Structure formats: C-alpha cells, structure tokens
Amino acid sequence: MKRRLFLKGAGLGAAAGIASPAIAQSTPTVTWRLASSYPKSLETLYGACTHLSEAVSAVTDGKFKIQVFAAGEIVPALQVADAVTNGTVEMGHSGSYFYIGKDTAFAFGTVIPWGPNSRQMQAWLFHAGGLELLNEVYAKFHI
C-alpha cells in the first residue's frame, strides 16, 4: 500500500517537474516605464533608477523590465507625479517636495529643508508609522 502511494506521489511530482518549464516559458514579459525628475547627468539620483531596472530584470530573468526615462524624455521634470497619477507611466522617481503645491503633506516625504537627518527619517518612516501616513497622502493621487 505504501509503495503504491509512494509511486503515485513520485509520478505526480515528476509530472509537475516536467510541466514547470512550460509554465515558466509561458509567463509574459512585462515592461513598465519609469519617468524620473532627474537628468542622466545626476548619476547618484538617475543612476539609482538604472541600477534598480537592471536588478529587477536580473532577478526575473528578463520577464519584468523597467525602462528608465530621464527628465523631459516623456514628461517634464516636475510633472512626474502627474504622469503616474494619470497612468502615462507606471512608475515615477521624483522628490515629494516638488509637489507641495498639490498637497502640503508631500513635504513630509522629504528631509529638505531643515528636516530630520537620514537616520531620523528612516526611524520615522519604518518604526513610527511615517510610511503609512505618506502612503495615505500618495493614495489620494493614485501614487
């Protein structure tokens, strides 16, 4: 009895293993566009997006690609949030301080000017509910 159960389980496992490559190959490639507020010449800021894009592509075997566009290539630098809100692009890389005219609460997403230092900001975001509060603000704009 145990032998039959073992053989049945082994057979199902082998069938699943044989089918796995076919399932993996049928996964469609997804491409998202990321608009940045920063020019290519600002390697620290713009370069972070290209590194993210390369890392995501690598860990997904090229099945999820992020095309990075510098300021002005799709939308002007200060309209990245609008582009995400309107669905023009799937992702945006910008500073929330650019959008305090839309909602002054965007100021809490940045440390400029005279805000907390990087450790204080990380503590507020990840240990004091800051990220949840910012997500509520961003959600109003479909970001």
Residue locations for each model-derived region?
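Short, polar/charged alpha-helical segment
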Residues: 42-67, 128
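Immediate post-signal peptide segment of exported/extracytoplasmic ligand-binding proteins
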Residues: 19-37, 58-64, 139
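Extracytoplasmic small-molecule ligand-binding "clamshell" domains
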Residues: 66-84, 107
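N-terminal export signals
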Residues: 5-25
